[in-house]
């Protein structure tokens, strides 16, 4: 198994400096990760820094709260793609889901899917805030709206990915969608366990440590 190609090498901290982003890009080139995941302000820089590689540029939309309007999320998506993004990780409207407004949750996801054209869309469900039934429902809505992946977490709420959540999400979407585990993978064994539970992508800032067989600091 080429575990490196499961990893979205991630730096989403609001105080990330250019030299830290450059280090992220250098590591991504060296280890040939699936993608780097950066905030929208760094997309153009990341695209240039990864020229000549097959490492994708992933960015986030409606991040981290998911509480912007669908029109804003669609605009963010279009601009990110214009700037070079290959993949979009969007946050659902958690409040709408909790309120039972499933039509809004679905249309919100669909707005981003439609704005993304042929680019990959991953739907962050923020599983730590949801009941198991809500997790099932929102995964079904993401599938119905045409998204490519469901993703556990932003890394900015009360918890990251769990094996149980990844397994439940995989059981819900079947083999038709990807499942991304974000947060929670701090070692090679952690990453492997997520893959065995059904993850096809792992979002982590610890990709290098994981591949080296080290235990990473932090929880994202």
Curated annotation (Swiss-Prot):
Its main location: cytoplasm. Pfam families: DeoC. It catalyses: 2-deoxy-D-ribose 5-phosphate = D-glyceraldehyde 3-phosphate + acetaldehyde. One of its GO terms (biological process) is carbohydrate catabolic process. One of its GO terms (cellular component) is cytoplasm. SUPFAM superfamilies: Aldolase. It is found in: Cytoplasm. CDD domains: DeoC. The active site is at residues 89, 151, 180. Belongs to the DeoC/FbaB aldolase family. DeoC type 1 subfamily. This is Deoxyribose-phosphate aldolase. It comes from Streptococcus pneumoniae (strain Taiwan19F-14). The gene is deoC.
């Amino acid at each position: 198994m080429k575990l490196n190609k499961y990893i979205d090498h991630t730096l989403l901290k609001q105080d990330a400096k250019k030299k830290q982003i450059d280090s992220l890009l250098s590591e991504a080139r060296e280890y040939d990760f699936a993608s780097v995941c950066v905030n929208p302000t760094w997309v153009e820089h990341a695209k240039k820094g990864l020229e000549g590689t097959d490492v994708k540029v992933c960015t986030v939309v409606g991040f981290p709260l998911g509480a912007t309007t669908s029109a804003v999320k669609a605009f963010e998506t279009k601009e990110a793609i214009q700037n070079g993004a290959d993949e979009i990780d969007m946050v659902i409207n958690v409040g709408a889901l909790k309120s039972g407004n499933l039509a809004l949750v679905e249309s919100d996801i669909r707005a981003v899917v439609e704005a993304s054209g042929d680019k990959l869309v991953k739907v962050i469900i923020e599983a730590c805030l949801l009941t198991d039934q809500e997790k099932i429902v929102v995964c079904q809505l993401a599938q119905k709206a045409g998204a490519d992946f469901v993703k556990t977490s932003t890394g900015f709420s009360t918890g990251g990915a769990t094996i149980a959540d990844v397994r439940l999400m995989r059981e819900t979407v079947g083999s038709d969608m990807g499942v991304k585990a974000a947060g929670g993978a701090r070692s090679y064994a952690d990453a492997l366990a997520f893959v065995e539970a059904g993850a096809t992508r792992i979002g982590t800032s610890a990709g290098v440590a994981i591949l080296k067989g080290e235990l990473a600091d932090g929880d994202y």
